[in-house]
Amino acid sequence: MVEDSKARIGGPNNSSVTKKQEPRLYVVLCEASLETYTSNDHRTSLLNCDDHQGILRKMGRDIAEARPDITHQCLLTLLDSPINKAGLLQVYILTKKNVLIEVNPSVRIPRTFKRFSGLMVQLLHKLSIRSMESSNTHLLRVVKNPVTKYLPADCRKVTLSFDAEVMRPQEYLGDKQSVCVFVGAMARGHDSFADEYVDDKIAISNYPLSASVACSKFCHGAEDAWAII
């Protein structure tokens, strides 16, 4: 792994700081397609629909399932948001294989998919990515399930469903209670992926949304509800 493929800790917005007196937004990217493949020449790569169509067909897999780029897009959207820079966002990734990954709010995810893929291969192999500046800081790490053990006891848990009542995210978000939104990080599928966790299902648009846009709308809603500029 070349050095510039590694995640780096952020600058002044290093947000391992938890603002306990303020509500927080938690986002869980569910059904994330993060799976490694080792070729005959012993090279390991992140399985994806662009580079491994033939391999996926041989496996009898739906090519549309191998979309790690969706997780990449969501992470860039979430970590660039003002609510993350304010220290009030925590992101988790739950893969299709039920691997739970904790994302440090200060991590700088590589902008290119190629470098992101290399980072994910390293993470899934080593189970942790540490800061280059401080070996005690985990930027990405695999943690034990279930994700609910990392949420506040009074945290409202919600997922998005096109069939549910449409409302603006800021209407759902209160001014004092933390909320965890479960977002499907897949190209298509049913909205039942988080039924075991959630209290509510809502729709936030009259139109189908990509996972990245759904993340963006919820972040903007929280920023409006909690006066984050």
Swiss-Prot record:
GO terms for molecular function: rRNA (pseudouridine) methyltransferase activity; rRNA binding. It catalyses: a pseudouridine in rRNA + S-adenosyl-L-methionine = an N(1)-methylpseudouridine in rRNA + S-adenosyl-L-homocysteine + H(+). The keyword rRNA-binding applies. It holds the Pfam family EMG1. The record marks D69 as: Stabilizes Arg-67. GO terms for cellular component: nucleolus; small-subunit processome. The record marks R67, R108, R111, R115 as: Interaction with substrate rRNA. Coiled coil: none annotated. It is an enzyme of class 2 (transferase). Keywords: Methyltransferase, Nucleus, Ribosome biogenesis, RNA-binding, rRNA processing, rRNA-binding, S-adenosyl-L-methionine, Transferase. S-adenosyl-L-methionine binds at L160, G184, G189, H190, D191, I204, S205, N206, Y207, P208, L209. It is found in: Nucleus, Nucleolus. Its EC number is 2.1.1.-. GO terms for biological process: rRNA base methylation. The keyword rRNA-binding applies. S-adenosyl-L-methionine-dependent pseudouridine N(1)-methyltransferase that methylates the pseudouridine corresponding to position 1189 (Psi1189) in S.cerevisiae 18S rRNA. Involved the biosynthesis of the hypermodified N1-methyl-N3-(3-amino-3-carboxypropyl) pseudouridine (m1acp3-Psi) conserved in eukaryotic 18S rRNA. Also has an essential role in 40S ribosomal subunit biogenesis independent on its methyltransferase activity, facilitating the incorporation of ribosomal protein S19 during the formation of pre-ribosomes. Homodimer. Belongs to the class IV-like SAM-binding methyltransferase superfamily. RNA methyltransferase NEP1 family. This is Ribosomal RNA small subunit methyltransferase NEP1. It comes from Candida glabrata (strain ATCC 2001 / BCRC 20586 / JCM 3761 / NBRC 0622 / NRRL Y-65 / CBS 138) (Yeast).
